[in-house]
Structures are given as C-alpha cells and as structure tokens.
C-alpha cells in the first residue's frame, strides 16, 4: 500500500522535470515490476540506459541516488 501512497506520487510529481529516457525508467517502475535481481547493472541492461541515467532519475525523485531508490522500492514492494 505504501507503494501507491509514497513512491508513485514521488515519481509522478517529478515526471515533467525528466528527460524522455528518464520518463521511460519512471514508467518501468510505475508498472510495479517485481524482479529478483535489483541491481543498477540489471536495470541499465534491461532498460538500455546508462547507470548515470538511473542515478539522475532517482535524484529527480528526491533520493540521494539509485541505491537509495532501490532500497525504498524493494521495501515498498514487499509491503504491497
């Protein structure tokens, strides 16, 4: 439930400030994808984006970096 109350609004409220590539990353996470391997390497390969893009996306969502974003994403997906 926290996923819908916390993470989704954080992503959606920052969409207008994102590049097209960052918006593609956002859409991936808004689909509530559950994956086994939650590493930046896996995401950059799967989404065909650089690790820097993942970091910029996370920072625009209010996190210090992609690791912090993944930590919260993982926690919220568990609670869902």
Cite the ranges covered by each PLM segment:
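HTH-adjacent hinge/linker in prokaryotic transcriptional regulators
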Residues: 2-8, 13-27, 31-49, 53-80
């Amino acid at each position: 439930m926290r996923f819908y109350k916390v993470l989704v609004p954080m992503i959606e409220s920052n969409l207008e400030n994102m590049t097209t590539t960052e918006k593609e990353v956002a859409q991936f996470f808004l689909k509530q994808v559950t994956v086994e391997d939650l590493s930046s390497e896996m995401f950059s390969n799967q989404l065909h984006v650089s690790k820097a893009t993942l970091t910029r996306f996370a920072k625009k969502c209010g996190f210090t970096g992609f690791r912090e974003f993944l930590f919260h994403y993982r926690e919220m997906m568990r609670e869902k």
